[in-house]
């Protein structure tokens, strides 16, 4: 595989699993050194395994840092300092090369599904709003701000924010979550202007992705989602072998759920979404900024 990111340094937040891990794998495979961030103790072993995998398989420098993005004002400088430490490990200050972050992927996020005056969960309160916006909005803002002085000075930097199709659809019960992702897309356009001399800034808009978050949404949400996925051209599924290969050890479970509870319309896979993120990190994407690029099988197009 070509290594267009050789020698670059990337930060990927929320990269212990799912889309973040898939992005880290793609960047490392193409030569980038990677700092992976994670939050919970339960993700420590997964993250350690990913660091070892990427380092040994691709011969790049990979480290992780555990920090709570819900406390963004504390987390942002910790992440930048960890990135500096990683950079110094392969490019010591004595070498004369200035610390630089080439790629920032704001991927970490949390979900929220709660109606106004929800009959089961009660009314949305300030605590729920703060929980979601702290991680989905404030953390990307403060981390991008902290990284900005260390971006390249020649417009070769790349920032990609991971949003959600929820920001476009207006799902029932997603006032808080969809609002947070809409805010991230708006900030994308602002940063594209403010950081134009250093980096392109784009947002990737994924649809449903096979993994923990979509599984936890459950049958009620899947039924609510059905009209949207029915109209998405790439989500049609009928047991295709290439799709089942992507599901790996969960192929049987995937096949059963998609056929029986998702109306034969499949979610995407983390690696498919990571492919779009990767595309926006390339040199060839340098004329694209301030954009929301869909990685949702045509789902957003279906509601235009």
UniProtKB/Swiss-Prot annotation:
Pfam families assigned to the protein according to its UniProt record, in alphabetical order: adh_short (PF00106)
Reactions that this protein is recorded to catalyse: D-sorbitol + NADP(+) = L-xylo-3-hexulose + NADPH + H(+)
Keywords from the named record: Carbohydrate metabolism, Galactose metabolism, NADP, Oxidoreductase
Binding of NADP(+), residues: 19, 68, 107, 177, 181, 209
GO molecular function: oxidoreductase activity, acting on the CH-OH group of donors, NAD or NADP as acceptor; quinone binding
Gene inactivation effect: Decreases growth on D-galactose and impairs growth on galactitol.
The enzyme's E.C. designation: 1.1.1.-
Record bears the keyword Phosphoprotein: no
Alphabetical GO biological process terms: fatty acid biosynthetic process; galactose metabolic process
Keyword Secreted (UniProt): no
Pathway: Carbohydrate degradation
CDD domains named in the record: SDR_c
Sequence similarity: Belongs to the short-chain dehydrogenases/reductases (SDR) family.
Function: L-xylulose reductase involved in the catabolism of D-galactose through an oxidoreductive pathway. Catalyzes the NADPH-dependent reduction of L-xylo-3-hexulose. Is also active with D-ribulose and L-xylulose, and to a lesser extent with D-xylulose, D-fructose and L- and D-sorbose. In the reverse reaction, shows activity with D-sorbitol and D-mannitol, low activity with xylitol, but no activity with galactitol, ribitol, and L- and D-arabitol.
Protein name stated in the entry: L-xylo-3-hexulose reductase
Gene from which this protein is expressed: lxr4
